[in-house]
Amino acid sequence: MSFVAHPNIDPKSLGKVGVLLGGKSAEREISLLSGNGVLAALKSRGVDAHPFDPGLQPISELAAAGFDRVFIALHGRYGEDGTMQGLLEQLGIPYTGSGVLASALAMDKQATKRLWMTHGLATPRFAMLYANTDFDAVVADLGLPLIVKPAREGSSIGLTKVIAADQMRAAFEKAAGLDADVIAETFIDGAELTCPIVGEGPTAEALPVIKIVAPESNYDYQNKYFTDDTQYLCPSTLPDALEREVRALAVEAFRVLGCRGWARADVMLTRDGKPYLLEMNTSPGMTGHSLVPMAARANGISYEDFVMQVLAAATLDLHPNEHWKPE
């Protein structure tokens, strides 16, 4: 489906809606901001929307709440990694965004990168790090600088830019404190881009690319969400042909992972103009600093209209009629 300005969506047709926010991950604070923004947008359009925080409320209450569909505004583990999607499949409650497998794949950076590489999509070279890894050998193979990060965290949490070999151990330990799997990837020196995608399969399409200009090129957790020093360029100022190339790469990355509904591809652009995929976010931020609403606005779509269309596309991996029912 194409996302449009001023969609004709009857709020009553959406039924009773749960907005899942907060949760238990390291990105809880951002999820609360996203979820409250989504909740306010839905209520402003007359939707019968209610907050639900899995970090504070037992899952039994989710099952008993009588939601007809849910908007997943959770970020990170237990919300973006396939676990919540699997629970909602079991409950037969349609939900926004990607299904169980695509969510799990996209949350795991090494699985994502291996799949993209198999399909010939450009992504930085990488190695998995463990306590007994020969870090000097990794540096010799991949070169410096390197990015060391947890394989299953987002929002740059636990990430370190390593510029000297003797920094590897500390960078590994920082990331390993958050995830048993740690990834080191070649640092791409160039422009940071992001590109939202909406739809599914052959109907998937990219929204405008955003170019990110962060203070001292450091687009970390603080600069992503809590400062006004980062510049976001949308239109991206890229040449038209390069903008189209980045959009096409983002859409193909989305399709290869089996994503649906909406997502956001993060991309690095080398100084000679070659785009490299970094990761796919299947439950993007919807805060005041978030990028998907910005790209939507560039297409003439308000925050509220975008949220309504994401919610209207809520579905299940398995059609409700296919769910097994006891005799």
From Swiss-Prot:
Broad class of the protein's primary localization: cytoplasm
Cofactor note as given: Binds 2 magnesium or manganese ions per subunit.
Cell compartment(s), UniProt: Cytoplasm
Reactions this protein catalyses: 2 D-alanine + ATP = D-alanyl-D-alanine + ADP + phosphate + H(+)
Cofactor: Mg(2+); Mn(2+)
Pathway: Cell wall biogenesis; peptidoglycan biosynthesis
Chain positions recorded as ATP binding sites: 139-194
Molecular functions per Gene Ontology: ATP binding; D-alanine-D-alanine ligase activity; metal ion binding
A GO CC annotation given for this chain: cytosol
Chain positions recorded as Mg(2+) 2 binding sites: 279, 281
InterPro entries to which the protein is assigned, alphabetical: ATP-grasp (IPR011761), ATP_grasp_subdomain_1 (IPR013815), D-Ala_lig_Van_CS (IPR000291), D_ala_D_ala (IPR005905), Dala_Dala_lig_C (IPR011095), Dala_Dala_lig_N (IPR011127), PreATP-grasp_dom_sf (IPR016185)
Domain called ATP-grasp: residue spans: 113-312
BP GO terms, sorted: cell wall organization; peptidoglycan biosynthetic process; regulation of cell shape
Highest taxon of source: Bacteria
This protein's UniProt keywords: ATP-binding, Cell shape, Cell wall biogenesis/degradation, Cytoplasm, Ligase, Magnesium, Manganese, Metal-binding, Nucleotide-binding, Peptidoglycan synthesis
Binding site for Mg(2+) 1: 266, 279
EC code: 6.3.2.4
Function text: Cell wall formation.
Family: Belongs to the D-alanine--D-alanine ligase family.
Protein name in UniProt: D-alanine--D-alanine ligase
Organism of provenance: Cupriavidus metallidurans (strain ATCC 43123 / DSM 2839 / NBRC 102507 / CH34) (Ralstonia metallidurans)
Biological classification of the source: Bacteria, Pseudomonadati, Pseudomonadota, Betaproteobacteria, Burkholderiales
Gene field: ddl
